[in-house]
Design a protein with these regions (language model features):
Chain A
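Non-catalytic interface/targeting segments
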Residues: 1-53, 60-61, 80-82, 89-119
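Conserved residues at the C-terminal ends of beta-strands
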Residues: 69
Length: 119, 287, 282
């Protein structure tokens, strides 16, 4: 299973970037192999609807779970269609959020928690 | 390094005047204007521009006349009436690329469009990063991202421990871009019906970022009932009101003179502004 | 005659000028139309106690998927520049609120699985009283692309009327849509550096579009000539000055127009109109 965290850097020591659609990178961890790598979020360069482009990117990288701060309605719909589960946190290092996720301390989003454009 | 972003929801609440005061009280900080659609912090801080950069936003269509066969297909299919007589009106073009896809002669290309400029400047109170979006250009959220990224780099270079950003009005995409990753959001509001209306929405937006959120009521004595209403609302939203600035003609006078009100050095707002700044420093220090 | 009213900065008194100008022209031989194109916050109707005679919905086409025809080839996703379509796990998802209705997906779908279907984006309301018509556009909540609704309001323009168009603040796309093709633009500003800063942006926009303009200074104070100096420098006429007076603000806050609360303003607005007519004739 692959877990992605929206981040401002490329390692587990970097901070969570709470904006799903506009974060710089996703740090991805493969639960089975234990491997960690980062992908650039090219979705953030979109003129509009960056959340949808980002969801597509995560789908293409076969991500199963994404940990982020804010999810808008469009991004949520797209992630749902891609069968990617969303967990939300507010701040901390990528490794801390992964730890919280593994311990069951992050809440699973059942709907968008911000409006379009993050409003 | 700490980042403070000043936002307001509604425009015209005195956000920029308060930031101007903070710039002088902080002594030396990195100043950043995230209102790229209608920047106005420069009016108070009088920056001298040191470096200018171009900003390319969305792509727009361009016709290559040497390949165009005048078939008229693009003109017929363009929903925005942006193509007339083989010419593209870049103001009307929304960059949908339908023309690019349907052109049988491959005579249309999509080209990044120069949508604005951004600058690194010097002011008396520290370096400033600001921008100007071109006329009728979209994509201001992306430009705000660019400006803030540069602000962090410049602050690092100059060994500055604080970035103070002026956020755009509203609650749309550019506001979100100016809040992401900030340590503290200071919401400047006023005791009017629309001020009250916007407060709840903007506080909700800010609290989604896990930053410290606090409220300052500007011109609080214009309507004491509304002021109390705002204080109650803030309590309900669990955000502290850390400053109440009285209506002060000196604020308007300072704007007319193009200087921060603290430099003018008179009026009823001086002391409350100083106290507000102490509160901000205290909250930022505790983080 | 089509006159647009704009201001770089919000809250400068655009609607105050538009409503009083319209009321002052009621005795003119030509009919008067006031178009409220501030579709996100239409408020001109507050000042005219008129019953709405009719309302029309505004629709824009968005794609609809015929899942029997769809081959999930991804062409539409590739074509759409606005991320309004996503292909996930063999489902095609459409996002109506980011769609620009460009038609790319349905023109280019190889199996004709996408067809345009109308989506309501707003409404246009019309009220009439004698030879005066008020046309108001309202953007549907949850929609944020206002130019199509503005265009629908402007489609009601009558070439034989004096048309006054009140729009949103700023100098961005919606404002360009309201000033486009008008004979003259009245810019409403206030005498502060912030007002001037935004006035300059609005004037730059009008120059690009080649539209003649003049300035109304609202909340004018005699000791301040910041706007005067700019206008003199640019050769822009100052059409009217409305002084900074609490009576004006108070009456206006109650929903009473300037010419109604103080009838001596009526000849001044009439003069403003005649000045605009002369400027356009030049």
């Amino acid at each position: 299973m692959r877990v992605a965290v929206s981040a401002s850097g490329q390692t587990q020591l970097d901070e969570l970037n709470p904006r799903l659609g506009r974060c710089e990178y996703f740090v991805i961890v493969d639960d089975v192999s234990g491997e960690t790598w980062a992908i650039e979020n090219t979705g953030r360069l979109s003129t509009g609807a960056a959340g949808i482009a980002t969801a597509t990117l995560l789908h293409n990288h076969q991500v199963d779970v994404v940990i982020t701060g804010n999810v808008g309605p469009n991004a949520f719909t797209a992630l749902e269609a891609a069968e990617i589960k969303v967990y939300t946190g507010t701040k901390g290092k990528v490794q801390d959020l992964l730890e919280q996720y593994r311990n069951g301390n992050l809440s699973k989003a059942s709907g968008p928690n911000v409006g379009p454009h993050g409003s | 390094m700490k980042e403070l972003t000043i936002i307001s929801g509604k425009g015209g609440t005195g956000k920029t005047s308060i930031l101007g005061a903070f710039a002088t009280l902080a002594g030396s900080s990195l100043l950043c204007d995230c209102d790229v659609d209608a920047a106005n912090l420069h009016i108070l801080l009088n920056p001298s521009i040191k470096e200018t950069y171009e900003f390319y936003g969305e792509k727009k269509a361009e016709i290559l006349p040497e390949l165009c066969t005048d078939c008229g297909k693009c003109e017929e299919l363009c929903q925005f009436k942006a193509i007339q007589k083989g010419q593209i009106n870049s103001y009307a073009c929304e960059g949908c690329a339908v023309c690019y896809h349907v052109c049988p002669a491959e005579a249309i290309k999509m080209k990044p469009h120069l949508s604005g400029h951004w600058y690194i400047s010097d002011t008396k109170w520290g370096p400033m990063v600001h921008a100007k979006l071109g006329i009728a250009q979209g994509n201001s959220g992306l430009l705000v991202n660019r400006v803030r990224k540069k602000a962090r780099e410049v602050a690092k270079e100059h060994n500055l421990s604080l970035i103070i950003s002026d956020g755009p009005p509203g609650i749309g995409c550019p506001v979100i871009s100016s809040l992401a990753g900030t340590d503290m959001a200071l919401v400047v509001t006023e005791p009017t019906a629309s001020g009250i209306h916007d407060l709840e929405r903007i506080v909700k937006v800010a609290s989604g970022f896990g930053c410290i959120t606090a409220v300052c009521i500007n011109k609080y004595n214009l309507d004491e009932d509304n002021c109390r209403f705002i204080e109650d609302l803030a309590e309900k939203l669990e955000v502290p009101v850390i400053g109440k600035i009285p209506y002060d003609a000196a604020m308007a006078e300072a704007v007319l003179k193009g200087i921060p009100v603290t430099i003018l050095g008179q009026g009823a707002a001086q002391e409350p502004l100083g106290e507000l700044w102490q509160q901000v420093k205290h909250l930022l220090g505790a983080r | 005659m089509r006159i647009s009213i704009a201001s770089g900065k919000g809250g400068t008194g655009k609607t105050l000028v538009a409503t009083s100008l319209a009321l002052s022209l009621m005795d003119q031989p030509r009919p008067v139309q006031l178009l409220d194109c501030d579709v996100e916050e239409p408020n001109a109707h507050i000042f005219f106690k008129m019953k709405q005679a009719g309302s029309q919905k505004v629709f824009l086409p968005i794609p609809k998927v015929d899942y029997d025809q769809c081959q999930y080839c991804g062409k539409c996703v590739e074509v759409c520049q606005f991320n309004a379509i996503a292909l996930m796990k063999r489902t095609l998802v459409i996002f109506p609120d980011v769609c620009h209705s460009c038609g790319g997906c349905w023109y280019l779908c190889p199996t004709e699985a996408l067809q345009p279907t109308p989506r309501e984006v707003g409404a246009v309301g019309i009220s009439q009283s004698g030879s005066f018509t008020l046309v108001s556009g309202t953007l549907k909540l949850g929609t944020h692309i206002s130019p199509p609704v503005i265009k629908a309001v402007r489609a009601k323009e009558d070439p034989d009327s004096i048309v006054i168009i009140d729009g949103p603040p700023g100098s961005s796309c919606p404002v360009m849509t309201i000033v486009d093709g008008t004979d003259y633009c009245i810019l409403v500003t206030e005498p502060t550096p912030f007002g001037l800063n935004d006035l300059v942006l609005a004037v730059e926009m009008l120059q690009v579009l080649g539209i003649a303009c003049g300035v109304v200074i609202n909340r004018d104070v005699p000791e301040n000539d910041i706007i005067d100096r700019y206008c003199e420098d640019k050769g822009l006429p100052i059409l009217l000055r409305i002084p900074l007076k609490t009576e004006i603000a108070r009456a206006y806050a109650k929903g009473i127009t300037l010419v109604e609360s103080d009838p001596h303003w009526k000849p001044k607005f009439l003069e403003l109109y005649q000045r605009v007519v002369r400027e356009v004739a030049q």
